[in-house]
């Protein structure tokens, strides 16, 4: 239950449910990630699913940003209301679904660098869900498809699309993808 629901229920109980209350103040304001110091408990299984998927899908990619984008693509599917992803509500659902992330294998090793990237992205995702803006997301929410060739990854909004993400957002990992 959020704060607004708690306030409304309390007022309703105090007034016998007969009063209407209007709030002109924002209940939840967006804040920048630089203003927030929060620790998140991230499920180890979620980190492992992402890291093992990264091993299969992006281990040959040099760019941390492109590796992180694979994680964001997976999380975009978890959050998506698209028909294609209607039965994918967890990271496990997405990476183990038939014909989706072919690089996931339960026997893939957990490589420290990939575990660190997976955990970093999950922390940023949870911050975003808590209303923090500018968390260092590297892929817009509508990008739910990707393919890679072992050297680069390309992300798109539809599997048939010829238009790909242009890497125009700031890179929290500080490498230059455009030369």
List PLM regions with ranges.
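N-terminal export signals and maturation junctions of secreted/periplasmic proteins
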Residues: 1-47
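Bacterial extracytoplasmic/cell-wall-associated proteins, especially those involved in peptidoglycan
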Residues: 30-31, 35-179
């Amino acid at each position: 239950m959020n704060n607004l629901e708690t306030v409304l229920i309390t007022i309703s109980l105090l007034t016998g449910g007969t009063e209407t209350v209007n709030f002109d103040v924002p209940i939840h304001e967006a804040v920048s990630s630089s203003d927030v110091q929060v620790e998140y408990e991230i499920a180890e299984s979620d980190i492992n699913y992402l890291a093992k998927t990264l091993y299969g899908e992006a281990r040959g990619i040099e760019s941390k940003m492109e590796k992180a984008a694979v994680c964001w693509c997976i999380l975009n599917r978890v959050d998506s209301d698209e028909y294609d992803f209607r039965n994918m509500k967890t990271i496990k659902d997405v990476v183990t679904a038939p014909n989706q992330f072919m690089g996931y294998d339960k026997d893939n090793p957990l490589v420290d660098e990939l575990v660190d990237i997976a955990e970093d992205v999950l922390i940023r995702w949870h911050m975003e869900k808590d209303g923090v803006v500018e968390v260092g997301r590297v892929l817009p929410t509508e990008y739910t498809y990707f393919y890679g060739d072992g050297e680069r990854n390309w992300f798109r909004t539809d599997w048939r699309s010829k238009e790909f993400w242009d890497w125009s957002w700031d890179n929290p990992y500080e490498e230059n993808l455009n030369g």
